[in-house]
A protein has these predicted regions:
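Hydrophobic or amphipathic, alpha-helical segments that drive membrane association/targeting
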Residues: 2-6, 13-19, 26-116, 241-243, ...
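Extracytoplasmic and endomembrane cell-envelope/extracellular-matrix remodeling and assembly machinery
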Residues: 33, 44-52, 63, 75, ...
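Surface-exposed patches in mature extracellular/periplasmic domains of secreted proteins
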Residues: 72-82, 95-105, 159-162, 186-189, ...
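Active-site recognition of the HExxH zinc-binding catalytic motif
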Residues: 125, 141-149, 153, 213
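Short pre-active-site segment immediately N-terminal to the catalytic Zn-binding motif
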Residues: 127-141
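Catalytic Zn2+-binding segment of zinc metalloproteases
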Residues: 137, 147-164
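Membrane-active amphipathic alpha-helices enriched in small hydrophobic residues
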Residues: 167-182, 189-201
Length: 499
């Protein structure tokens, strides 16, 4: 089940203006925090001055910004990839120091090499990283670096640095940082409007942040049993690959990569004993899924990519390559070819969720819903709370026109996972399929609007749902109560711009 099946939200040019909603509500700051930064001068690491913003306030800004990202960026809602990236991220977080907030990891459908962290423990990764990171440790090195930015509160520190030189409100300071993170070109334009002295201070601050994030990131990699050499290796390969490029990757504008930084990271990594880290089958499968469905590569070219690697691959690597080719076959409705590739895979690993998910797509494509439901029910007996399996099961019920069964499952799911837009999208579809639950359909869609910070639309939907519900019913009372919550959330969201 891919993002396409789950109504993946792609930001249009008009909706991208929402990405500046906090930076629009927030953006009068002339100084960008993380752009074109190549030199250094930072306050002592142990004396991080963060009086400008509390951890609680960081969480508020992080929640607001995440809602805007959902509205403006092509977030990958693929349950398998979300499970993988969050599992990997939380393995790193469990081995990090100074963790003050829960972490959330998200994937953006963008082939550019980039990653960024923002307030509230959010770390965003571009799907293009999977195309360039050859091992899980290399991907983990980027994530560990971003986690360090969060644990060391580099955004809050940068705001403190700006506050010492610019008479700006907290909201405006946040706006300049958010603008630089989400749209480096806009951040650069803002930076050019600043005075030379302010810009130099910001440049100095950022380079030291990068050095600190590298140092702490390598420590986290080591504690989490990853290959610490992966960080300098990945940096070095990127630098070599783009040495003579006319246009540098976006990653370099937000993460400057001078030779000294590569040398320093290599020296730090050498302080740890060498370790042979086995190939991660899950990383290989996640990478194959990215290539097949989120790489921007034409189907024929993606198939060629898999076939070229298949010739020299180990037996373990061939599994992930066959899986990727099977996904291409399913998406092209070559169901017989897909079955030939998938059958031996799922026979060897019947509980592998990558293979279960692919077989579900195949069965749905052939309208063999009972086969898919039987396999999913068996898998759920072993893993009753797994979100990938639950969403696949609900999706299959919707496609099989068993809307009432899907509603029963999805009402529980959305209660447990209210921030998962996949659950609300499927619940909306399930209500719609019955033709008798227009109020529920409107409410589910309203939750999707709320997750994107589109409060007026969410309130409109819930108002209509309350009007459709039976007068005095429990459903109407529930809708009215949710309306009150949404109005309070909208007021808090708006209040961020007034600080």
């Amino acid at each position: 089940m891919s993002s396409r099946a789950l109504g993946s939200h792609k930001g249009s040019k008009a909706r991208r203006l929402l990405c500046y909603a906090l930076a629009g509500v927030l953006a009068s700051a002339p100084v960008s925090a993380r752009v074109e930064s190549y030199q250094s001068d930072l306050p002592d690491i142990g004396t991080a001055a963060v009086s400008t913003l509390s951890v609680a306030k960081e969480k508020e800004f992080g929640d607001a910004y995440m809602r805007m990202l959902r509205a403006s960026k092509p977030i990958i809602s693929d349950p398998l990839l979300n499970e993988y990236i969050n599992g990997l991220g939380h393995r790193l977080v469990a081995n990090a120091n100074d963790v003050r907030t829960p972490f959330r990891f998200i994937l953006i459908d963008n082939q550019a090499i980039n990653a960024f962290a923002f307030f509230g423990g959010y770390v965003a990764m571009h799907s293009g990283l999977f195309l360039h990171a050859k091992t899980e440790s290399e991907l983990a090195s980027v994530m560990a670096h971003e986690i360090a930015h969060v644990t060391q509160r580099h955004l809050a520190r940068s705001m403190e640095e700006q506050a010492q030189t610019s008479p700006l409100t907290v909201a405006a300071l946040v706006g300049s940082l958010m603008l630089a993170i989400a749209a480096p070109e806009a951040g650069i334009a803002a930076a050019h409007a600043a005075t030379a002295g302010s810009m130099q201070n910001q440049i100095n601050f950022t380079r030291r942040n990068e050095e600190e994030a590298d140092r702490i990131g390598i420590e986290t990699l080591a504690r989490a049993d990853f290959d610490v050499q992966a960080m300098p290796r990945f940096f070095s390969r990127l630098a070599d690959e783009y040495r003579y490029a006319s246009q540098m990757p976006e990653y370099f504008s937000t993460h400057p990569l001078p030779a000294s930084r590569i040398t320093d990271s290599r020296a730090r990594a050498r302080q740890y004993p060498q370790k042979r880290v086995p190939v991660s089958p899950d990383y290989q499968l996640a990478r194959a899924r990215i290539v097949a469905r989120y790489s921007g590569i034409a189907s024929r070219s993606a198939m060629d990519w898999f076939e070229r690697r298949h010739k020299e691959a180990s037996p373990a690597e061939k599994q992930s390559l066959n899986y990727g080719m099977a996904l291409l076959d399913i998406d092209a409705r070559r169901f017989d070819d897909a079955r030939k590739k998938l059958t031996p895979l799922i026979k060897a690993q019947p509980n592998n969720r990558f293979f279960i998910d692919a077989m579900t797509d195949l069965n749905i494509g052939e309208k063999h819903y009972d086969k898919a439901l039987s396999r999913l029910k068996q898998a759920l007996n072993h893993q009753p709370n797994n979100r990938v399996l639950l969403l696949n099961h609900a999706y299959t019920l919707v496609k099989a026109k068993r809307g009432d069964d899907a509603i029963s499952m999805l009402e529980r799911y959305t209660h447990q996972h209210p921030d998962d837009s996949n659950g609300w999208f499927l619940l909306q579809q399930a209500y719609e399929s019955t033709g008798t639950h227009r109020d529920g359909e409107l409410a589910a869609q309203g939750e999707r609007y709320a997750l994107r910070g589109q409060w007026d639309k969410a309130i409109r939907n819930y108002t209509q749902a309350a009007q459709l519900a039976e007068l005095g019913s429990l459903a109407q009372a529930r809708y009215d109560a949710r309306l009150d919550q949404l109005r309070r959330q909208q007021a808090r969201f708006k209040a961020l711009s007034d600080r």
